[in-house]
Amino acid sequence: MDQKLENILNLALETPEEEREQTESLNVGYSAESRSWELIVKYHGSLDGLREQNIVVEELIAGYAILTVPETLVDTVSETPEIEYVEKPKRFYYQQTDPDGASCFPPVTRRTPFLNGRGVLLAVLDSGITWDLEVFRKADGSTRIRYLWDQTIPWDQTIPGKQAASREQETLRNPTLPQNQIMPEETGDTGYGRTPDGFPIGTEYTEEEINRALNSSVLERYGLIPSRDLTGHGTAVAGIAAGRSADGLYTGAAPEAELIIVKLGLPREEGFPRTTEIMRGVTYALRKARQLNMPLVINLSFGNSYGSHDGSSLLERFLDNASEIGRTVICVGSGNEGAARGHFAGNITRDGRVELAVGNYERNLNIQLWKNYSDVFRIRLQAPGGEEAELSTNIQGGKYTLELEQTRILVYLGEPLPYAVAQEIYLDMIPAEGSYINAGIWTIRLEPVVTVTGQYYLYLPAGSGIGESTGFYRATPQVTLPIPSTAAKVITVGAYDPVYDTYADFSGRGYADSTRTIGVAA
């Protein structure tokens, strides 16, 4: 086990590719075509030595970088003295966004103190935007979008009139397409867009280019700027944050703010963005705010349940650092996990039995158990048919495999790491036979051996990644904030139900000890 690498990355590297492909999370960040990993690192000094070894380096802010590393060189990265810690990307899921008049925007935007966002940059990192809507325009019809960076549209040398793509962009482009293939809607030399400075992917469109496109016919616009919000999620988020109708009947929180839009993600089968793409988007927004000399608000409406939820991951620390640069505020949604049955918390002196319902047709499922390193538990896992096995928790780190009924279980026991305060025991369930893991009630029994705090937390993947029938019995609604809303220096925004005048039941919740709380409920 390499203690510079996070636990789930160690497990991924120790697991054969054919098994990783069966899991929900272990293969995220790996390109089978180029046989390379995309990795997030915390570093100091210079990374020029890695560049000389065919490793692509994207420096971000505050000593963070994204590396694209041939799998044979991952050990080289870990052994580099300048590298402090390494994580793999995580897949992020959309968080619910329902606008509601109960948020009371109009009273503060239309009269004293006129908090309408004028003179402020609002960066929305999401699924894109329907950029020609009137709600994102000024009174004269011109756009309020200063920059639109679509990470999914490659800037390619095969299109006449366009500059050659960099080596980094060639490495990072969509691995599912041949290197010289461009999607039909991206072909043609329009004279619009370019790869943004300092980034190897995507196409950036300026305010001037968007206005030129707006002055063309409706049919021509998306031929000039082919960026589309296919899900509508990003458009809804931007509308809540900064929308404004021409008649003034609809207004968002900051109807006069200027916008930076980042459509996240390289085109890929699962369609969800990764940690790395969010970090690129945050860095891009910070650089634009510095260039324009404007205060910046960044909105993130994505979340993931993987992690100890204590602010210690590289993404959480990255956002804490980003919030200290210039005049920057970062707002993150509290997610939809409050009522999703994806979390169970207990104390070994009181709760020794955890029951998990697994619905039909689950192709894989992972379970995280987080506890104090000083606590020692005896853990037994029982399958729906009654077959039972004890987990060997006395192994010092590393992976092993066991089988219960028709389900193979990859077990990883974490060791102390520089950026991990709690110990992780990670279980990844994949089919041993057939296409699905065993449905029914799985039981986890915990027995104390050495107790210091006795506290433990269990997490499943975010609700968007599992079936509705899968979840813990007696689930715990507390500590269901998704990462990165658990970062210490972001504003976490919860959901409020005006019909019942209460906190929305689906909205993620924080810790009962009040050290980490929801900043706003709207």
Predicted region positions:
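Intrinsically disordered, low-complexity segments used as extracellular stalks/linkers
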Residues: 157, 161-163, 167-169, 173-175, ...
